[in-house]
Structure formats: structure tokens, C-alpha cells
Design a protein with these regions (language model features):
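Tandem CBS (Bateman) regulatory domains
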Residues: 1-11, 49-84, 91-100, 120-149
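A glycine-centered beta-loop-beta connector
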Residues: 28, 36-52, 99, 107-123
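Glycine-/small-residue-rich active-site loops that bind phosphorylated ligands and cofactors
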Residues: 13, 20, 45, 84, ...
Length: 149
């Protein structure tokens, strides 16, 4: 059985809840990520998603009287705190089914209360591509003649 520890990202970019929207957007942009764990030490306390960041940005733009800008909105005011997590020993199948069922883009991997990694829908696409390539390598080509294989 393949476990999450085989595909999860462990070189994590995290943010503090006292950081601001501008910093969150900068980290997401510079690191090409859509999910930003919010940690106190190694404990996961929240999650900022690209969707959260865009919604917060949109709310600033819609209110012309607002004096708030990206530096004034704190991460703790826009982060999601009700976060589904998974243990690194969970199977890939279990995690993939959970992501699909709940229509979420990532699962932080938490063991003994500490954030150890994150697995995203992109990680599962990479697994699917790998499996498809393996199938293609083992199956004969449909259009090929027997002597061409």
C-alpha cells in the first residue's frame, strides 16, 4: 500500500497568523503554491488558500470607502480554522477519496499535533500521470502490428 509520506510535500512554506494578506499573496506567488499553512511553532492553526486571498482582495476592491488594504488584513482574520487533516500513514486511496468527496484541494499531514507535510490535488494528478505512463509501458500499442511490438 502506498502511503501519503511517499508523495506529500515536506519542504513547507508556512505563515504566521500575525502576517498580512500582502505577505500571504507574495509567498503564494513566489513559490507557485495555492495553500499556505498557518502555524504556531509546528502546530497547524489555520490555512490560507488562494481562494481566501482572492476573496479578501476582492472585498477590499468592492468597498471604495474602505481604508483597509492588503497590509492591514491579518492572516488570522481570513484563514480557515476548520481544517481536515490526515496522518502520514493514511493510504493514498483514502486521502484521494476524501479530497474528492469534500471537494477540497489539500490535506495537511499532521502527526502527533505537528505539521509534517501537505498533499494536494496536484500531487494526486502526478500519481495518476505516473500510473498512466506505467500502464502505457506495459500494454501493447493498439495500432501496432504484432511484429512492431
Amino acid at each position: 500500500m502506498m502511503n501519503l509520506d511517499m508523495i506529500m510535500s515536506t519542504n513547507l512554506i508556512t505563515i504566521s497568523r500575525k502576517d498580512n494578506l500582502a505577505r500571504a499573496r507574495e509567498l503564494m506567488h513566489d513559490n507557485s503554491i495555492h495553500h499556505l499553512p498557518v502555524c504556531v511553532d509546528k502546530e497547524l492553526v489555520g490555512l490560507v488558500t488562494l481562494t481566501n486571498a482572492l476573496a479578501a482582495t476582492d472585498s477590499i476592491l468592492r468597498d471604495p470607502d474602505s481604508r483597509m488594504h492588503a497590509k492591514a488584513i491579518l492572516v488570522e482574520d481570513m484563514m480557515v480554522t476548520d481544517i481536515a487533516t490526515v496522518d502520514e500513514n493514511a493510504s493514498l486511496r483514502q486521502a484521494a477519496l476524501f479530497l474528492e468527496k469534500h471537494r477540497i484541494g489539500c490535506l495537511p499531514v499532521v502527526t502527533d499535533g505537528e505539521l509534517h507535510g501537505i498533499v494536494t490535488d496536484t500531487d494526486f494528478v502526478a500519481v495518476a500521470i505516473n500510473l498512466l505512463e506505467q500502464i502505457e509501458d506495459t500494454e501493447p500499442l493498439e495500432d501496432a502490428q504484432p511484429d512492431e511490438i
